[in-house]
A protein has these predicted regions:
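Walker B beta-strand of ABC/ABC-like P-loop ATPase nucleotide-binding domains
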Residues: 191
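Walker B catalytic acidic pair
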Residues: 194
Length: 236
């Protein structure tokens, strides 16, 4: 196994297993934390600023069984395909490939019509979802923000590695495009969560009360995301 530092330097672990581990150095961290990057499908190790190589290597070796077991359990990556049924902004639709159509990608009631060659279908569906999300997520977020007397500076749709959303101190909100594939109540929860950060840049009791005021079923949405979120990352 090879560990790659932020500096670009690498060093080998004794029992090489042919995979890379990303290392993130954090000045605010006092302990080592290991997790799996769902998008890149690699282990990520967060270490304190002055962590030694030996300590990092020992920690990885001690958790080797967990790393291999967790990687093995990751679902296979998925491509959008003709005839596939997906949830799209809370509606069940069927992806329908029509090579000779001249529509690009369009939604026709419960069918998502995709034109062009089959080799472009996955990319076209993904691009459509991201473009549509800009409007759908913007409208819902602005509506929720108005309810708590806040304004959003900017909303962006991202292809993030692990986060479903984020809200900066400048009132800029980012959303992961994959959340469009979740049930509507999950989308509602995430929007309420990030919009609440406009008022509370923490996860205090006041923050969760704000979330609850915007979405009474927020716990249902959060539970679904915690349990099923990894499945959404099979789409890349």
């Amino acid at each position: 196994m090879k560990i790659t530092l932020l500096t670009g330097k690498t060093f080998d672990i004794k029992e090489a297993v042919g995979m890379d581990i990303k290392i993130i150095q954090s000045a605010n961290s006092s302990k080592l934390i290991l997790h799996i990057d769902n998008k890149e499908r690699v282990p990520v190790l967060s270490i304190p600023k002055y962590c030694t190589r030996k300590r990092a290597i020992n920690f990885v070796n001690e958790n080797m069984d967990w790393i291999l077991e967790t990687l093995q359990k990751l679902p296979e990556r998925k491509y959008f395909s003709d005839g596939e049924k997906i949830s799209l902004f809370g509606k069940n639709v069927t992806i329908t490939h029509c090579p000779t159509a001249r529509c690009g990608v369009r939604l026709d009631i419960d069918k998502l019509i995709v034109s062009g060659g089959a080799e472009f279908l996955h990319r076209r569906v993904k691009d459509y979802i991201r473009q549509k999300a800009e409007t759908e997520f913007y409208n819902l977020s602005v509506s929720l923000a108005a309810k708590i007397g806040c304004k959003i500076n900017n909303i962006s749709i991202k292809d993030t590695k692990s986060r479903w959303g984020s809200c900066s101190s400048l009132n800029n909100i980012n959303y992961n495009w994959r959340i469009a594939l979740a049930p509507q109540y999950v989308i509602n929860y995430l929007m309420a969560h990030e919009v609440s950060h406009l008022k509370h840049q923490d996860h205090s009791q006041d923050f969760w009360q704000c979330v609850s005021s915007l979405d009474k079923d927020w716990e249902k949405g959060r539970n679904w995301l915690q349990k099923n979120g990894r499945i959404l990352y099979t789409y890349f």
